[in-house]
Amino acid sequence: MMMMMMKKMQHQRQQQEDHANEANYARGTRPPISGEGPTSQPNSSKQTVLSWQAAIDAARQAKAAQTMSTSAPPPVGSLSQRKRQQYAKSKKQGNSSNSRPARALFCLSLNNPIRRACISIVEWKPFDIFILLAIFANCVALAIYIPFPEDDSNSTNHNLEKVEYAFLIIFTVETFLKIIAYGLLLHPNAYVRNGWNLLDFVIVIVGLFSVILEQLTKETEGGNHSSGKSGGFDVKALRAFRVLRPLRLVSGVPSLQVVLNSIIKAMVPLLHIALLVLFVIIIYAIIGLELFIGKMHKTCFFADSDIVAEEDPAPCAFSGNGRQCAVNGTECRSGWVGPNGGITNFDNFAFAMLTVFQCITMEGWTDVLYWMNDAMGFELPWVYFVSLVIFGSFFVLNLVLGVLSGEFSKEREKAKARGDFQKLRENEQLEEDLKGYLDWITQAEDIDPENEEEGGEEGKRNTSMPTSETESVNTENVSGEGETQGSCGSLCQAISKSKLSRRWRRWNRFNRRRCRAAVKSVTFYWLVIVLVFLNTLTISSEHYNQPDWLTQIQDIANKVLLALFTCEMLVKMYSLGLQAYFVSLFNRFDCFVVCGGITETILVELELMSPLGVSVFRCVRLLRIFKVTRHWTSLSNLVASLLNSMKSIASLLLLLFLFIIIFSLLGMQLFGGKFNFDETQTKRSTFDNFPQALLTVFQILTGEDWNAVMYDGIMAYGGPSSSGMIVCIYFIILFICGNYILLNVFLAIAVDNLADAESLNTAQKEEAEEKERKKIARKESLENKKNNKPEVNQIANSDNKVTIDDYQEETEDKDPYPPCDVPVGEEEEEEEEEPEVPAGPRPRRISELNMKEKIVPIPEGSAFFILSKTNPIRVGCHKLINHHIFTNLILVFIMLSSAALAAEDPIRSHSFRNTILGYFDYAFTAIFTVEILLKMTTFGAFLHKGAFCRNYFNLLDMLVVGVSLVSFGIQSSAISVVKILRVLRVLRPLRAINRAKGLKHVVQCVFVAIRTIGNIMIVTTLLQFMFACIGVQLFKGKFYRCTDEAKSNPEECRGLFILYKDGDVDSPVVRERIWQNSDFNFDNVLSAMMALFTVSTFEGWPALLYKAIDSNGENAGPVYNHRVEISIFFIIYIIIVAFFMMNIFVGFVIVTFQEQGEKEYKNCELDKNQRQCVEYALKARPLRRYIPKNPYQYKFWYVVNSSPFEYMMFVLIMLNTLCLAMQHYEQSKMFNDAMDILNMVFTGVFTVEMVLKVIAFKPKGYFSDAWNTFDSLIVIGSIIDVALSEADPTESESLPLPTATPGNSEESNRISITFFRLFRVMRLVKLLSRGEGIRTLLWTFIKSFQALPYVALLIAMLFFIYAVIGMQMFGKVAMRDNNQINRNNNFQTFPQAVLLLFRCATGEAWQEIMLACLPGKLCDPDSDYNPGEEYTCGSNFAIVYFISFYMLCAFLIINLFVAVIMDNFDYLTRDWSILGPHHLDEFKRIWSEYDPEAKGRIKHLDVVTLLRRIQPPLGFGKLCPHRVACKRLVAMNMPLNSDGTVMFNATLFALVRTALKIKTEGNLEQANEELRAVIKKIWKKTSMKLLDQVVPPAGGQCGLCFLSPSRSRS
């Protein structure tokens, strides 16, 4: 009994400790080990309790045990038993033999009976389970609670309050037991020292505290009610703490901890980024304050009254280009609250920050932009908002993703390594045990020899059986026949010996073999695929209002197919045997689907169940489509990697679920029953009960319209003017944690696993190639044996060679990214030793690109059968084409013709402008035609190699020019054809691709990416399709509704009805009743797929979800909250497709781009980091430090360079920022004056700073630093600003102007003044030069911008092409205020079209714009339509246009950004002990102190002190002793000049080389030669002088010269 108790205690203790270790490990602290008893190692002070340490200890113990066991061999069993116990013990106890403190709470020793009881209870397994169940039950209780408006309640809630006490008691008891068992605080493994325990502790204490408070307030309430209310609110706030209890579940699930740990670890780099984001927000908020303060409060009022003139008011402007009040008798004046109930504005710093944050999240930013356009005119606002979205969203927020994916893969590798080690240990253990058993068995065999013979016979009989090519035979033989023989009695044996049964067995065996061969054949596979395809067809042909015959056919087909699938299953079972059949996951799944189908059919036939319920089962059959993957390796690898990531995703989903639950419960506490402030409309996204709260939180998590929910929350607490603004914190935290952190972990997991899948693919390819090679070799050797004639042999070999070469030549054309050492065989036209622009998103700086192309020779063969290679005409053409002026001219013409396309007027096609542009068009077309003819004359048309038409890019040119020519030919005959051809002219800019090399590489890279993405496209489309089919089953015909909500079927929905505007009985409006379908519906598979696509882009999905929830019957109106459970369909779809598949899509693009970038350096022996560091070391130049000789100047210089001066300026900038942020709308005159004076003071101070610096550094030295130039610009701008505001006193009072409308001059003059006021804000940017981490971030930012020019060009081209097509197709749609195509958002001019596309790229309600461009829309009154054709504008092409644009943008283009960023910012998560380019700046800075003149050399004696000042990994650090530093320096082999100096680049290069171990092993001279070759290969332009400096050639001087001086010094 005692033994069992001990064991149990050990087990529980191990568990507790594991948790403690895990948590401590997560926080990065290592619990020290208390006195470890006799087993502890002498160096226990240094030991770290990581789980592998425990394992190593165990290994040592096992070794010791082994040595014992060898000395005493006989009792093997007992020994292995003891060993196993020992191992288990050591494993359980971690490292410390007694983790519990000797005393708990200063009084209870380990032998104290109370404490022993506590320990045994706490470490008892059922106790753990009980607590987990209690937590779970508590969550359920919290969820059942229904919040009511005005703090009402019902009996359930009262009962729940009582249950709450029970939970509180349970948790309190648990806490006290644990505290007694482990001690409270002072010991290493004490209770509160574990993070999870601390959380428990706080929750319990707060719970107790709230109960006590409640009792106290109840007692005081007896006296008077008013005092109790406030106490009640406090309790409510404390009650909200209970919602954290679900977090305790985390400590029970280890895989959750990996995800959580990686998120927690990522917090440090994330903080850097958070600072950067905050910085961007602050700068933009202050600029917004300066530009837009008080602009949102003017709107159109009726003259002489305070009644707003419009239904949905918008800001307006007195004059200028803003919105004018159109209705007569209305005027523009201030006095309106502002949009969104006055929440969205720039009236003071807090509101401005909230508005800017909302714009960065890309929800509702266009609304703010449009309001600003209305208030100020459209010249200025777009610059502000578009730059904010590009910087804030695309760049800075994508950094979050980079950091998370880096951390996640690191954390996963750690966990994996830990797991592998554990497995290794266990295997060793097993082997030892096995050895023990083998000893036993050999002994036993010696005793019992008779059995052996029988076994032999049995074996013989088995081997005679022929085995098939598959392993399953053997398993099945054993399982099938072995069992029957074993189970039969003597009777069975008698029967089995008879002839008949033997025949039957033989026949059975033969049949099964035949069946198996059939099942495994490719024909059978294709048959099944055809059946699956037919099955898919029947299911997808279902739609709303289908004719009866179709329904019958579908029923019959379903039954027939079901029968066939059942047959297939049975045949497989028979041929493979049950055991082998169920090994494959696919077969299990198949079986499940078939059984489901059979049950469904039976239930429907017996009319036990409506067909709808189970028809979803039918759709699950569609999963069979994935059978295709069996013979398609890359696809099956992809599916495999998806299934692999399911594990990590499951734990992430659990975490996500916990997160959603906690925030839903919190939301119910805060907003339950509060969203009833507007009686006229029912809000759908509320927190009134648990399911609804879950949906709302999930909606905020996807980021769709989260700002609308936030506005409701603020209004519920009294609107923007009250303290209600505080609640926005809840929404912001929820949005940041959920959308940015948790959802990006999805992406991180995706990227991580995809990289694995890719490596799997390549490995398989290599294996296949290897097999192929062996096959060929075998064939050859056979042939050689056949005919032993040596001549034949030689011929065969040489023949082989030729074919291989030919093959290579052919393939060279196809492979756009050859490795480093193979010349590009892209096309005869550009032959080059190496692509100068690396493929992938990191092209080198344009300055480095060698844009000179080698001139391509005239190809062999005659052009047009008449012009030979030497024909003078042809030679002349060749010269002309290759002349640089000609190529540049053509580029210019391409640009001009593109500009002409953009300048066309889409509405009035016969306007003067269009006529002029038409003439230009003729000219451009003529020029391009001549160019093509010249090229064809030179290269020939297409019959021979290298001809003009053999290059895809040339074909593109031909197409574009041909289209233009054709459209001139048929000017009037068929209008629509011409229209299409005119649209095709848009492809002109694409011709530039062929002219700019860098662009060409990016484009090729995109194509490669698209090729590789193919597989994922297939999987995603299949999933889309499946969900669409299920959606059709669930919702077909159910999304109809009447415009009058009182009527619920088409028969009643006729005539007119009266609507009261805003619930006001005095303002009735008459409307017509119309029975209409939803724009997005599930009536057939295609519309279902479109609806689901919009859901997967997260745009407008809540509206669709609530339509689905309200859906009632086919062709019947909605019923409020009719089936809430339907929302599960949408949530599963969003999680599988939108979160997971779309992220994998994105991840795939990123992985592909990174691989393409690396491909170029495939054979260059240096990895990316080494390349970057070496490049830096080769290109860096020493910094000049100016130290003045003049003593007075030196004093100035000394002051300016001192730290106190720096800090003073820092503080001043902060104060200046504070002053700027204090401005607000309607500020008093006094405040205004104070602000102006402060502004002058600051301007004065910064001017003084500039003057001091100019004196100290002299103008030349001052302006050589970029930051100083920036400073001086700001100072000059500020001075102009002060001067202007003094000269024009009206400006300084930023009170709104009187309602009189001053002239336009006033307006423009004001804009110029506000422009100069921006200089005040720009001082903030100076802060960036101060922080170290931020500086590195900025440096990387600039670096990634250099990688972006071609990507940006590609994006610009995409936008250009789509904008021009949009103008041609949708330019005539009329602008209406209540429509998506309106004054702010339309295709009527080129800039407007580009802005609209930019809006779609950020995903702002793109699907609504698409609907507004469909056919049947009203035409613009100015456009040329015939009478009766008012409603003919728009086109069905809109669907293709918008969906293709959205996909290109969201998945390809924006991911180019992400790929570039993740590439450049990997240093944020990399191990800081590995040298990276960001460490090398420090070397330059410190070198300049020893070499102020930037001569590039210092005395060798200074090198040691220099390196001891630089921190590792680059230098030695201050802690490195002098002698060690000297020794390490000698080992570096740094070249030393004859005058005893060392060179800058040589020193830096040697440091990089030793830190990254680049070619440091082996023979030194040989390594140097190899390294020289690599450098020459990658950096062709490195001068030989520099190369000899950094890597001395063989026989040159070497770093051993360091020996003598260092000896003399030491």
UniProtKB/Swiss-Prot annotation:
It catalyses: Ca(2+)(in) = Ca(2+)(out). Residues 53-66 have a biased composition (Low complexity). Pfam families: Ca_chan_IQ (PF08763), GPHH (PF16905), Ion_trans (PF00520). GO terms for cellular component: voltage-gated calcium channel complex. The keyword NAD does not apply. It is found in: Membrane. IV repeats lie at residues 1190-1465. II repeats lie at residues 508-754. Residues 1073-1163, 1418-1484 are annotated as: Dihydropyridine binding. Expressed in brain, heart and skeletal muscle. Residues 1-99, 448-487, 765-846 are annotated as: Disordered. Voltage-sensitive calcium channels (VSCC) mediate the entry of calcium ions into excitable cells and are also involved in a variety of calcium-dependent processes, including muscle contraction, hormone or neurotransmitter release, gene expression, cell motility, cell division and cell death. The isoform alpha-1D gives rise to L-type calcium currents. Long-lasting (L-type) calcium channels belong to the 'high-voltage activated' (HVA) group. They are blocked by dihydropyridines (DHP), phenylalkylamines, and by benzothiazepines. Each of the four internal repeats contains five hydrophobic transmembrane segments (S1, S2, S3, S5, S6) and one positively charged transmembrane segment (S4). S4 segments probably represent the voltage-sensor and are characterized by a series of positively charged amino acids at every third position. This is Voltage-dependent L-type calcium channel subunit alpha-1D.
